[in-house]
Amino acid sequence: MLGCSSLSIRTTDDKSLFARTMDFTMEPDSKVIIVPRNYGIRLLEKENVVINNSYAFVGMGSTDITSPVLYDGVNEKGLMGAMLYYATFATYADEPKKGTTGINPVYVISQVLGNCVTVDDVIEKLTSYTLLNEANIILGFAPPLHYTFTDASGESIVIEPDKTGITIHRKTIGVMTNSPGYEWHQTNLRAYIGVTPNPPQDIMMGDLDLTPFGQGAGGLGLPGDFTPSARFLRVAYWKKYTEKAKNETEGVTNLFHILSSVNIPKGVVLTNEGKTDYTIYTSAMCAQSKNYYFKLYDNSRISAVSLMAENLNSQDLITFEWDRKQDIKQLNQVNVMS
């Protein structure tokens, strides 16, 4: 299983931010990647068709196959996006539909970030493609995916490949997880509109005065498991009621706090094969600064890469390896016994 949760927020100083978790049973050889302008990105593995990208972008991904595969990222125009698992619902074609171009599902994020500015551009681009059932070389199959994008205006969309083609959800609440589709998750929210940060009122039963045991009773009923539907509800609830950030730093802090509600420790979620599904990394990004932030399962320090600090016309990819060592700040002197 490859899980994932994502959300977008807006700060009071009009910064648009996006964040996601990456939950998986294996760690691909991932790193932070800056793809410069005109680098050239494939559409398919089986055909040597390369599209030069107009815009540079940064995000988390892999360089283990022919073209860089990004799982999420932000481009120089402030468009942000991510791929998320869409098991049993994603539908891919065997051949391109008439008038469209075939694309491997894992290259969608790279192609979109490399060539789009707004969510309107994303919709136009993706409706010109047919997502093909072409296996990923590393996984050995075409992973079932859906996609979410947020632009500098703050609008978030969800793109889902299904039996009817591509379904586009506009003006979403800016939250997404995994299967089922976005519309189902949005409808499911209606069953939880009574969940609130406010404490319930005391009530009388005869002469008995009943009071809550403590703070937080207004959240009773919010599910605590790790299913996609439960994670969607928790992220939506935390997003709605978390105090609004004043600036980018506060926004990034809020994003990591909100997504901590769906972080999965090793051993808590197991597959049918007994493998552990866990949160490998959590990332956040800002449309205005083009900064990309992340922290790892093994190292909870927030690291950052600034897209605009690099040569965006470079001929080569710019990569940043993971530092997996836990970064603990020691506040007093440690005596080493001789």
From Swiss-Prot:
The EC number on file is: 3.5.1.11
Q: Which GO terms describe its biological process?
A: response to antibiotic
A single GO molecular-function term is: penicillin amidase activity
InterPro entries found in the cross-reference section = CBAH/NAAA_C, Ntn_hydrolases_N, Peptidase_C59
Cite the active-site annotation.
4
Q: Which reaction does it catalyse?
A: a penicillin + H2O = 6-aminopenicillanate + a carboxylate
Q: How does activity depend on pH?
A: Optimum pH is 6.0. Is very stable at pH 6.0-7.0.
The UniProt activity regulation field reads: Hydrolase activity is rapidly inhibited by lysine modifying reagents.
What applied role does this protein play in biotech? The triple mutant BspPVA-3 (T63S/N198Y/S110C) shows improved catalytic efficiency and conversion yields, suggesting that it could be a potential candidate for industrial production of 6-APA, a chemical compound used as an intermediate in the synthesis of beta-lactam antibiotics.
Residue stretches in coiled coil: none
Q: Which domain of life is it from?
A: Bacteria
- Give one Pfam family, short name only: CBAH
Task: Summarize the thermal behavior of the activity.
Answer: Optimum temperature is 60 degrees Celsius. Is very stable at 30-40 degrees Celsius.
Keyword Nucleotide-binding: yes or no?
Answer: no
State which residues form the propeptide: 1-3
PTM statement from Swiss-Prot or TrEMBL: Expressed as an inactive precursor that is cleaved autocatalytically at Gly-3/Cys-4 to generate an active enzyme. Processing exposes a catalytic N-terminal nucleophile residue with a free alpha amino group.
**What CDD domains does this protein map onto?**
Ntn_PVA (cd00542)
Role according to the record? Catalyzes the hydrolysis of penicillin V to 6-aminopenicillanate (6-APA). Exhibits high specificity for penicillin V. Penicillin G and other related compounds are hydrolyzed at less than 10% of the rate of penicillin V. Among the cephalosporins, cephalosporin C is resistant to cleavage, whereas cephalosporin G is cleaved at about 1% of the rate of cleavage of penicillin V.
- The entry's protein name is Penicillin V acylase
